[in-house]
Structures are given as structure tokens and as C-alpha cells.
């Protein structure tokens, strides 16, 4: 059994945490986030740390309190450091560029793909083959990166497409004559 939930989440200086019922709110230098904890989990703020505990000794409650603790730790990291996902584009003629508040992707289709950047997310294009997705909410950052990758996922023969910077593409060999 994992013991992630037993460790309290320390709130660093410069971050204010409030617990109202089942809602945990964090406010820091990068912004404000909140998370609603499941009813099977007790949440308290004491001694500069947020503590979670299962309300009942059921398997579900024990699983949820570890998850709740990890989510609260993500709130703290988000409002202090933020989260970033890096994407790489591989392929001849494949490139990305910013067009106002939209991301323009040339991915081998007959048209360019325009991606509307959601609220709370910052996208930068340092090179035409690199995309950085930055934000304070890890779920939103991951979702945006996944949506961009889904426009042209990497294919296993030449590796062309949009991939995460740390992703390994299993390569296949072509047909034999």
C-alpha cells in the first residue's frame, strides 16, 4: 500500500492556503488554484501544512486520500513554479508559429492547423520545431499538449509528427523485398 497520503503538504512562504469545507484554495506568486476534495477524505490546514486523512477505512477512501494529497501538492507547485510541457516537431516542412493568440501548425495537411490557446495557458515557440506549453494547472497543461500532439502523432516508420520532448518512439522497419 502506498503511503503518499500520510505525508502532509507543507505550504511555503509566499503561498496562502485556505480550506473551506472540502475545497482547498492556494494563492501564490503565479496565480490562484482550487481543488475540491472527495467526501471520503478529511482535509485540515494546521501548522503551515495541509493534512489529509481517510474518513472511513475502506479501500476507496484510502485510495482517494493519497490522490487528494498528490493533487494538493500539485496546487502548491503550480502556484509557485508552474508546469511546463515541451513538444518537438519532426518532419520535412512541419513547423509551428504563433499567430496572434493562436498557434499555427503546418503538419503536412492541405491546410494549416490553427489552435486556439485556452485561458491560463502560455505557449511559446522558441524554434519552428519546438513548442513550450506553460501554465499553473498541470491537468490543463497536459491536456493542451495532448491536443496539439493529436493533430499529428509520431508515426513509427520515420518518426514524423508532434511528440513530447522526453517521449521515445518505437521505430519499425519497412517492408522487405
From Swiss-Prot:
Keywords, comma-separated and alphabetical: Ribonucleoprotein, Ribosomal protein, RNA-binding, rRNA-binding
Keyword Ribosomal protein: yes
Family in the record: Belongs to the universal ribosomal protein uL6 family.
PROSITE patterns: RIBOSOMAL_L6_1
Protein name, per record: Large ribosomal subunit protein uL6
GO cellular component, one term: cytosolic large ribosomal subunit
Subunit structure: Part of the 50S ribosomal subunit.
Organism, scientific name: Rhodopseudomonas palustris (strain ATCC BAA-98 / CGA009)
TM region positions: none
Biological process, per Gene Ontology: cytoplasmic translation
Function: This protein binds to the 23S rRNA, and is important in its secondary structure. It is located near the subunit interface in the base of the L7/L12 stalk, and near the tRNA binding site of the peptidyltransferase center.
InterPro entries tied to this protein: Ribosomal_uL6-like, Ribosomal_uL6-like_a/b-dom_sf, Ribosomal_uL6_a/b-dom, Ribosomal_uL6_bac-type, Ribosomal_uL6_CS
Molecular function as annotated in GO: rRNA binding; structural constituent of ribosome
